[in-house]
Amino acid sequence: MLSSARGRIVFWEGASMWVLSAAPNVGKEGIKGTPHSHHAVQVTFALDGWYRLESGDQSVGTAIAAVAPDARHAITANGTVAFVYIEPESVAGRAVLRRLFAKRRLVSVDTALFGSLPADLLAAYRDPAVTEGRLVEIGRALASRLSGEVEIPTEDERVAKVIAWAGAHLATSIRLADAAAVAGLSPDRLRHVFVRHTGLPFRTYVLWLRLLKAVEAFSRGESLTTAAHQAGFADSAHLSRTFRRTFGVAAAELRIS
């Protein structure tokens, strides 16, 4: 990720989008990030300016590029760059893996796939009146264009009940067996139904709920420790480890200007 940057970050279940701009005092050489890896698929968009991604002996500087899960890489960038992160265990994430990473861990992505969405995102990012909901809408659309049509059935009342229950109990231990009891299903049956209707395994979905909760609390000004406890992490170190594994940065780096 990039230091010396300002920007906006939005999260939704199974994905997130980070739009970052180089600080005004950054020169033509841009900001150089440190080499790192993370478990989420990363798709990088040059909204204005430029970037270059490096992974091993590969180097990509196209308008849009993607990095496979757990691939060590570094970025140098200037201008405004967007990162869309997708959970690789999700239905959409698995579709992206099949589509992009059959031969290489760092790939260019055809800009025609996204139409006007990158320009829409840049305009929305520059408009201080644009809501978080609008940014999430654009982020979801970008992820959807990348994964292609992923069939998710209409909402199941039992799954909706489990999601509401899990969201209300994030500060406690959440077990599949307890969730199954809420749904009135066996654990094995809930596991199958949950993936079918959300695109994410139950355990992964709960982890993203916890990350969303922690980010929300931290953005309100809570300490990292308080945010971690409210979201059901053991402590701030546990939250930071989880965050770094998923996105390649510590949770404390969310406090960008």
Label for each model-derived stretch:
Residues A95-L97, G148-E149, R245, E253-S257:
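Short, charged, intrinsically disordered terminal tails
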Residues R104-G115, L122-S186, R196-T204, W208:
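Short, Lys/Arg-enriched, Trp-marked, Pro/Gly-tolerant hinge/linker segments that flank
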Residues S186, A234-D235:
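Short coil turns linking two alpha-helices in DNA-binding domains
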Residues L190, F194, H238-L239, F243:
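Short hydrophobic/aromatic patch on the recognition helix
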